Amino acid sequence: MLGLVATLCFTPAVLAALSREKPNLAGTWTLAFADVVHPDGTRGHDYGDAPKGLLQIDAQGRYSLLIFDSARPRFASNDKKTGTPAEFETTVLGSSAHFGTLEVDAAAAAITFRIEGSSFPNWEHTQQVRKYELRGDVLSYRVPARANGDVPVSEWKRVANQP
């Protein structure tokens, strides 16, 4: 009898439904890498060899994401209002920050970021969908291809010992 119950409980439909459960992404994540896959299949580092970043997601899906190239040079003047054009360029291209809400579609393996504020103003009040993969405490996703065909890929590791 127990075998029959187990068989009925784990039909393909039930297993498929279980696999579509929304994963719990709430918590703090640190950036493992922020790479870019070029159209020819080669891979590069989008934010330098040792990027740093933090992704925080609360239980309601509000998030804040920060990525920085750790090799960004300091401003010679020590004043962000008087930087040179080259200093401003490396600052903008060496960082990415946005916040808002996110939603997970487990069946489509997609995360939708509803961006409320961003270091790149063109992203504000937009929605961006990224294909994701969650393996234990490792979250990775692919950003839609840029105009030149490059595909940014980010991987995050959940910070241990969170409540």
Predicted segments, located by residue:
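Lipid interaction determinants
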Residues: 7-163
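Bacterial N-terminal signal peptides that target proteins for export
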Residues: 1-3
